[in-house]
Regions:
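Metal-dependent enolase-superfamily TIM-barrel catalytic cores that perform enediolate-based chemistry
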Residues: 1-68
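Short loop or secondary-structure boundary microenvironments that flank
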Residues: 1, 27, 99-102, 176
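C-terminal extensions of enzymes
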Residues: 159-203
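Shared catalytic-loop signature of beta/alpha-barrel
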Residues: 39, 45-48, 56-169, 173
């Protein structure tokens, strides 16, 4: 715990007070541990704490949020707008993070964003930024895109026209829909062939 505090102190000292710091515990803590750790990190003004406990633990997130005052970010591990509605209604989340590849594509992503808007909550789509950027631009409550190293279609090399992030910003393609053009040859290199092994027959 002390090591986390020293890391936060060092980073905050390095970047200064105006740069938002987002923390992700990757569901590693119990609610009690999350409260202790978040309380110790709060002096460094974290912008959000993402999934401090098991993602499905709605009431635990409510408890951690109320006990610490640190904004809770979650959503990458939720799959339906009904789950999102449950968490929003309970007051378990401050920043909503739907993943377009998990919630069912553009239509569901936009429904979740509209639902979040009704709770006055911002949306920061998780992962696959090339697919999410058009949707984000259509969200009145869109915050920004969350990107991960190696997690973009451009980095995977499957786009005929890569979309670049410049100084932390990207522009959506001018074409409708997701607007991206895949490179068929590059996609072929990622093709999975063969069949999955059959489960053993019950004895």
């Amino acid at each position: 715990m002390e090591e986390d505090v020293e890391r936060m102190r060092s980073v905050r000292r390095l970047v200064g007070p105006g740069v938002p710091l987002m923390l992700d515990a990757v569901q590693k803590w119990s609610a009690g541990e999350a409260i202790r750790r978040a309380s110790m990190l709060r002096p460094f003004d974290p912008y959000w704490l993402e999934e401090p406990i098991r993602a499905e633990d709605r009431d635990g997130h409510v408890h951690v949020r109320r006990a610490t005052g640190v904004p809770m970010a979650l959503g990458e591990s939720l799959f339906t707008r009904y789950e999102f509605a449950d968490f929003m209604r309970a007051g378990a989340v401050d920043i909503v993070q739907p993943d377009i590849s998990r919630v069912g594509g553009f239509t569901e992503l936009m429904k979740i964003a509209k639902l979040a808007e009704s709770y006055n909550l911002p949306v920061a789509p998780h992962f696959l930024i090339e697919l999410s950027v058009h949707a984000l631009c259509g969200m009145p409550n869109g915050l920004f895109l969350e990107d991960l190293p190696g997690g973009s279609l451009t980095e995977l090399g499957v786009l005929a026209e890569p979309i670049r992030v410049v100084n932390g910003e990207m522009a959506p393609p001018a074409r409708p829909g997701h607007g991206i053009i895949f490179d068929p040859a590059a996609l072929a290199r990622h093709e999975i062939t063969g069949r999955a092994p059959a489960s053993p027959a019950p004895a």
